[in-house]
């Protein structure tokens, strides 16, 4: 019943519910990599670039302002049909503290929606579209062509002595995510996407300390801005909060090489079973080419879209 309803609605579902619906109708055991987290995740990893460069099948299953209970149940939902080798967890979501009472309510809500999925989908017949129609979804990634330069301090990752502590309920759910990945033979990779507005050394230090203590791989791309070739005058859509598609392409190119060097994933590009990915990637390239002119104009004039 759940599969039928979601399959019928998937093309109409947008916003926070879309990843749940879309993951439900993805062919079984076809995804190599899942990317979870808040909006930093799905604005930073271009699924079609990873496919075109490395033949890696990726789904961005993040949600705007996704909280850690949502992350956990999103991944638990995904593991019902998928066997990804890697789960990337974007770390900005690990600092969302909603308070003890609200966090308890959040946990109960997410648990209920996971075990009784009709609660999640019961309003989808009258879904309100909250994404602009012009944005096409590519396995969770959406091309963002806005340009709004970051004009803050370039040394936003300057070392600080103190750490910023993760909320306790976040640590509980992070451990549950670790256990979930281990149970499903997926390697957990913590990644901090470049974001001067959201990230700093205090947060980096906290995640690094946690990762070292747990033996989890942690990659902070805020420490690699020059290596990535990021230009904060051109590669952000909203003054350093999120990357635009130019920034996402640079980050994804780096991630693809990093994954190739550190993990063993099969290249599916010549596998006829995955021909739909080649077709979607071609559509992505055509769409990307059509908007590059607009971005170039924005870069030259210094005015965002």
Regions picked out by a protein language model, each given a short descriptive name:
Residues 45, 70-74, 110-123, 133, ...:
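Extracytoplasmic/secreted proteins, especially bacterial periplasmic and envelope-associated proteins
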Residues 100-187, 268-305:
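Secreted/periplasmic serine-hydrolase-like ester/acetyl group-modifying domain
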Residues 36, 40-117:
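Membrane-embedded segments
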Residues 4-25:
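Alpha-helical transmembrane signal-anchor/signal-peptide segments
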Residues 35, 60-64, 161-167, 191-197, ...:
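Second-shell loop/turn segments in exported
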């Amino acid at each position: 019943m759940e599969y039928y309803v979601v399959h019928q609605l998937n093309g109409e579902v947008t916003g926070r519910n879309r990843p749940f619906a879309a993951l439900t109708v993805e062919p079984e055991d076809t995804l190599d990599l899942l990317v979870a987290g808040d909006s930093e995740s799905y604005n930073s990893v271009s699924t079609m670039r990873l496919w075109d460069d490395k033949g890696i099948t990726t789904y961005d299953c993040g949600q705007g302002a996704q909280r850690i209970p949502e992350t956990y149940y999103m991944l638990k939902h995904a593991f019902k049909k998928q066997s990804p080798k890697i789960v990337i967890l974007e770390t900005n979501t690990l600092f969302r503290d909603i308070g003890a009472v609200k966090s308890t309510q959040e946990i109960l809500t997410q648990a209920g929606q996971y075990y009784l999925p009709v609660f999640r989908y019961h309003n989808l017949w009258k879904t309100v579209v909250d994404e602009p129609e012009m944005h096409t979804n590519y396995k969770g990634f959406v091309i963002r062509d806005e340009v709004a330069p970051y004009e803050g301090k370039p040394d936003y990752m300057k070392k600080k002595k103190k750490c910023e502590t993760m909320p306790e309920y976040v640590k509980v759910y992070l451990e549950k995510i670790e256990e979930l990945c281990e149970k499903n033979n997926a390697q957990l990779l913590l990644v901090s996407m470049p974001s001067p507005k959201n990230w700093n050394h205090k947060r980096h230090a906290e995640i690094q300390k946690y990762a070292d203590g747990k033996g989890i791989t942690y990659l902070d791309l805020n420490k690699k801005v020059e290596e990535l070739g990021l230009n904060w005058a051109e590669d952000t859509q909203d003054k350093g909060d999120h990357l635009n598609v130019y920034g996402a392409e640079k980050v994804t190119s780096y991630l693809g090489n990093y994954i190739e060097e550190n993990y063993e994933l099969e290249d599916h590009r010549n596998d006829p079973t995955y021909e739909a990915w080649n077709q979607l990637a071609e559509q992505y390239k055509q769409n990307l080419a059509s908007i590059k002119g607009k971005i170039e104009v924005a870069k030259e004039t210094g005015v965002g879209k």
